């Protein structure tokens, strides 16, 4: 698929989760929304070698929008930079929660609460509905059962305003 926006990060918790055999687990609302969009690419070094690109593309496939570079960090793709940003935001939040949950249970994955297959299926259906609504430019707020996920553009603008307020516009652009 064509990609307009791409976002790569070395976010601490996302990089840490990329170093685990489990990858991103469907244990938080954020991770359940994205887990079916994730593909993995084995570590080959610093990812600067042009010959690695075809292998990365093959591992990503035509349907996935998130590529976890193992032992490195996530890369998200979107129809816009806002789409790619929102996916990265969800990846990083998922990894934050997972890192804390894994630490809380001493790494014993059997002690983590994983939603039932029925809940995962319902959330997957809701996430699919949200994606279709955003593509059509429709609202996906709580009023129509969308779960309150705002559009990627609104999230991106809100985060940009937060950064401007925190650091000053001259420091972030």
Regions found by a protein language model. Give the residues of each.
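Glycine-rich flexible loops
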Residues: 1-173
């Amino acid at each position: 698929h064509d990609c307009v926006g791409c976002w790569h990060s070395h976010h601490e918790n996302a990089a840490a989760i990329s170093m685990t055999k489990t990858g991103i687990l469907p244990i938080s609302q954020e991770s359940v929304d994205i887990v079916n969009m994730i593909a993995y690419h084995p570590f080959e070094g610093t990812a600067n070698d042009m010959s690695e690109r075809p292998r990365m593309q093959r591992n990503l496939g035509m349907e996935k929008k998130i590529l976890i570079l193992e032992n490195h960090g996530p890369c998200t793709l979107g129809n816009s930079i806002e789409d790619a940003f929102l996916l990265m935001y969800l990846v990083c939040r998922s990894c934050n929660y997972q890192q804390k949950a894994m630490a809380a249970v001493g790494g014993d994955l059997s002690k983590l609460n994983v939603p039932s297959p029925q809940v995962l299926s319902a959330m997957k259906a809701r996430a699919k509905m949200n994606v279709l609504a955003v593509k059509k430019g429709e609202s996906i707020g709580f009023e129509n059962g969308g779960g309150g996920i705002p559009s990627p553009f609104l999230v991106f603008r809100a985060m940009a305003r937060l950064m401007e307020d925190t650091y000053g516009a001259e420091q972030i652009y």
